[in-house]
């Protein structure tokens, strides 16, 4: 994973985590939260598969979470992250869908 892709993946992880912990009063579809959590898991798994040390990955995600936590749901950014993930990770869309099915 290139440094540019890693930075984007961290940003997307932060956006996805913010989606999961939306402030009260925000409207959203529950399936969006499921897809966001599954996407975080798939991005981390892929990062580890490509040789990024887990501590390095987690540090980057934590910084991104701090950046986006408490923000309102941004459908455009979320969709851009889905497109990024699906382009970056082979079978990314299928991997996310598979994880969604195992969340419960």
Predicted regions mapped to residue ranges:
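Compact alpha-helical subdomains of small soluble proteins
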Residues: 30-104
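Short N-proximal segments of mature Sec-exported proteins
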Residues: 2-51
């Amino acid at each position: 994973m290139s440094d540019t892709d890693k930075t984007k993946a961290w940003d997307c992880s932060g956006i996805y985590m913010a989606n999961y912990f939306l402030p009260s009063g925000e409207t959203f579809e529950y399936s969006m939260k499921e897809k966001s959590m599954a996407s975080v898991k798939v991005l981390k798994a892929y990062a580890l598969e490509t040789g990024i040390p887990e501590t390095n990955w987690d540090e980057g995600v934590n910084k991104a979470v701090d950046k986006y936590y408490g923000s309102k749901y941004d459908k455009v950014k979320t969709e851009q992250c889905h497109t990024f993930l699906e382009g970056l990770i082979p079978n990314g869309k299928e991997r996310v869908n598979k994880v969604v099915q195992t969340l419960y």
